Each structure stands twice: as C-alpha cells, then as structure tokens.
C-alpha cells in the first residue's frame, strides 16, 4: 500500500510544536511531556500547519534542499511514525 501524499497532516489537539531555547532545538510539547526533535524532524514539523498536504511539504523541502535523494520517502516515513505515535492526524 502506497502512502497518500494528498493527505494533510495536523498536530493533534494538545500537541504543540515550538522552539525551546533550553533544549536548543525544536520540541513537541504534549500534556504528558515533551519530545525533542532532530533537525530533519524539526524542518518537517515546521511545515505542518493544517493547510499543506504532504506533497506540498515535500515540494517545499525539495526547494530548500534540491537533489537530496529519497527526500520524499524520508518525509513519508516521518509522517507514518508521527501518526503511529499519535502526534498528528492525516486527513
């Protein structure tokens, strides 16, 4: 089954993506705690706005990082993990 890039990711209620100076990086805050995101996840997370679909997020990052092999696949993987961890919904 292939990933549907026309789906739009949205942070779940109670989850907030932000830069945290104390962590020197981006984090995902939620009622039970916090997850520190690596640089790649932070770049993707910064584009999750409930407006862009996955294809648009891939296109935007491809503009910023042209020629990166398997960029789309990596973003799909992030979306799958984020959905499995209940950080986002894909509608």
Swiss-Prot record:
The keyword Transferase does not apply. GO terms for biological process: pyrroloquinoline quinone biosynthetic process. Pfam families: PqqD. InterPro entries: PQQD, PqqD_bac, PqqD_sf. GO terms for molecular function: quinone binding. Disulfide bonds: none annotated. Coiled coil: none annotated. Pathway: Cofactor biosynthesis; pyrroloquinoline quinone biosynthesis. Keywords: PQQ biosynthesis. Monomer. Interacts with PqqE. Belongs to the PqqD family. Functions as a PqqA binding protein and presents PqqA to PqqE, in the pyrroloquinoline quinone (PQQ) biosynthetic pathway. This is PqqA binding protein. It comes from Pseudomonas fluorescens (strain Pf0-1).
